């Protein structure tokens, strides 16, 4: 019932095994430009002192072994170093994400570990048991999304990929008015108005498992790149035209002044349209991939609040134009 039920969050939970010492448990999150790498227990101690080479060794992705030359110093200090349990990276807008971490203790707060603009949508947890990464395609584009790693202190941890993050406002499926405006704003039918029944949204998650060792930043960034921009089979315009699977249409021709002018105008129009999603922030779980229908020359913005003139929703002319542009 759209009047009483609101979507606070929807996600997928994956559990994984942790084993070994806390200082050999690693957490990585893909940010704007690289990996945010942390440790459940970072071996940085003021008193008693642990040699810096031990801390450096951790961040180089190496396990600290029991026969390490600094193990006595580690064991002397380990009881006074925080054991971090939970890491969250949350993209609640298309322009900002936040990373927070906590010890998951009752009555204790989480702390901010950093900010960025557009996260890449991958998290990784690794220990002596191996590692796991979870990636969300179009992570920042389909905000509000988040990835949580919890239970790093435990034998069993979990990663939750939130397609709609519970840290955001609940999703309200009600119409903006209690009456229809079919004639005035070209939307739906007055008898039915706007109804959320039948709404669907496809989301892609990728899980990768690693046998041993701590996976390098470069490897994880390559995984993220592959998930965000997977390889696709694309034919040439000539092939699409030849097989006629999409009916009759013309290839690009510039053999007359008129055809040259038409092609130039089409190029200018598509170039403008392709830049609009980023300029206008046409992002969000239910908006990404869609485009606006009609521009308001007086407000100097798209008619976002005028029903059928707002989101295009694969209807009529823009869809045909964009598909034909792709094929040509």
Model-derived regions: residue spans:
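Conserved catalytic-core segments centered on acid/base and nucleophilic motifs
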Residues: 1-5, 322-328
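Extracytoplasmic/secreted proteins, especially bacterial periplasmic and envelope-associated proteins
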Residues: 218, 222, 257, 317-320
